[in-house]
Regions:
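Non-heme Fe(II) oxygenase catalytic core, chiefly the N-lobe of the double-stranded beta-helix
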Residues: 1-126
């Protein structure tokens, strides 16, 4: 496994760890990395919605977004799509996902399908 630190404060890119492996041993590695680096990135992990949900369940009960409808067969997964000419800025301003809950979410899994060469940034804070 290779760990590349992305900044002095938080964030690491992880190579050599398969997110399809839902074993307790693999999850422990992922969870330990998350606790240490706060935000972790995995490239080219072509996981299915079922595999994404299985990974998420290791962190605790899955939640459905209160305001945004999830996917038809996967209500815990919200798909964010922006068309080329669309002017709306979904989540444009600084926010913390579902931080309004009495018990805030422990973790959020973002899976990027197509990332534009410019813009589309997601910022993180600890």
């Amino acid at each position: 496994m290779e760990i590349k630190l992305l900044s002095g404060a938080l964030g690491a890119e992880i190579k050599g760890l398969d997110l399809k492996d839902t074993s307790e041993e693999n999850f422990k590695k992922i969870n330990d990395l998350l606790l240490e680096h706060k935000v972790i990135f995995f490239r080219n992990q072509n996981i299915t919605p079922e595999e994404q949900l299985a990974l998420g369940k290791h962190f605790g009960p899955l939640e459905k977004h209160v305001y945004v409808k999830g996917r038809e067969n996967y209500p815990e997964i919200v798909r964010i799509i922006k068309k080329p000419n669309e002017k709306n800025q979904w989540g444009e301003n600084w926010h913390s996902d579902v931080s309004y809950n009495a018990k805030p979410t422990k973790a959020v899994i973002l899976k990027s399908i197509k990332i534009p060469p410019v813009g589309g940034d997601t910022c993180f804070s600890n």
